[in-house]
């Protein structure tokens, strides 16, 4: 009866061919879906149900390619526009439950865990991503078991914090969030530290490590970041803090901090570049007693899961990043979700830094950015422009004229006194890098007229470069390190 009822409901509904040409889908999505239907579907299944299984599988993997960890059936049903009607979320759940070898249903104990997809309420996962979420959640529960209930530092702890960092010498811990973050780290094995650029995350991180080494001189510390570039910046930022912020640190602790070498998470976890399997795991955990990860918002769901699996049982973990930053290129918004989770269930393990110490003098720009982050409607760009001009005259509005976007870019470079043809005279790689570092064009989006892809092409026109020929002096980005 259930199958007959579902078939009647879905007979006039959407078919795979109606979705194949949509830009959110790739041919690989439909190849994956066809494989699921071929290997996991019952031979006696109604054709309409098989088509819905195919659509669900293709859409689930399409979501992963677009950096989501799963397909939210409820949202998708409300947002997907098509000539034929979509089943509602309840109908999707009913149909998918008819294919237990393809879809594991979490609320059904009889459902085989080996299925390639997993249904959790209205969320349809590729099973390995659901397993990643479960591993991260299990480790977070371990951290929550010994979470502090109060975060008031002792007088001795406050004295140590003030003594070790000159910025905190006369600071009030009730008002200074950086001091609060340091104090929280002393009483908990987990700290998530989030804040925008210039809010002092590196200062907090360095002070925490200095205090730990002062108390435990032989503590093993591992520093990591998602990319080699981020790891390099981490090293430079720590060196800068050691030169300008830390005071009263014993020579041995200073040497230990100077010797710390941040590495990529892939290298830390000994991930095989061919298989993606981590050499460090639950059976062979890391040897570090304190693990510090920077730029966490760039870390994917799978990489976060591998990190959590490799942590020793009693290790301390400090996660640093900006939860409002763009998400990982791969699936998941893990750091943001962890911050949201801790804010609800364990606020003593979360600290949010809001004061911008780097750009604090530029009040107009800081207020504008804060309005965007806070979601207080769309800020008025004209007010921002007027404020910036009154402050230092740096804002220029360049309307597009007959010369188009390329002409506007050329005028911008000329107004900023950037010698357009200087790249042709670069006699060495060092000079070429220096020219590239003279200016940067930032885009809010990747695609579209004002996106990264198009503006890079326009810049090639401005500079007289033929991108397909890769001329000397043309900047390139390495997308994969296969060494």
Predicted feature residues:
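Conserved phosphate/pyrophosphate-binding and hydrolysis machinery centered on Walker-type P-loop NTPases
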Residues: 22, 26, 66, 126-130, ...
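ASCE P-loop NTPase helicase motor core
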Residues: 179-182, 186-389
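Intrinsically disordered, low-complexity N-terminal extensions of AAA+/P-loop NTPases
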Residues: 1-87
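Short helix/loop segment immediately N-terminal to the Walker
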Residues: 150-153, 170-173, 180, 278-283, ...
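Interdomain "pre-motor" coupling segment immediately N-terminal to P-loop NTPase/helicase cores
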Residues: 85-156
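Conserved pre-motif I regulatory segment
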Residues: 157-190
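N-terminal positioning helix adjacent to the helix-turn-helix/winged-helix DNA-binding module
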Residues: 52, 132, 177-178, 189, ...
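Conserved helicase motor core of P-loop NTPases
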Residues: 324, 328-475, 480-483
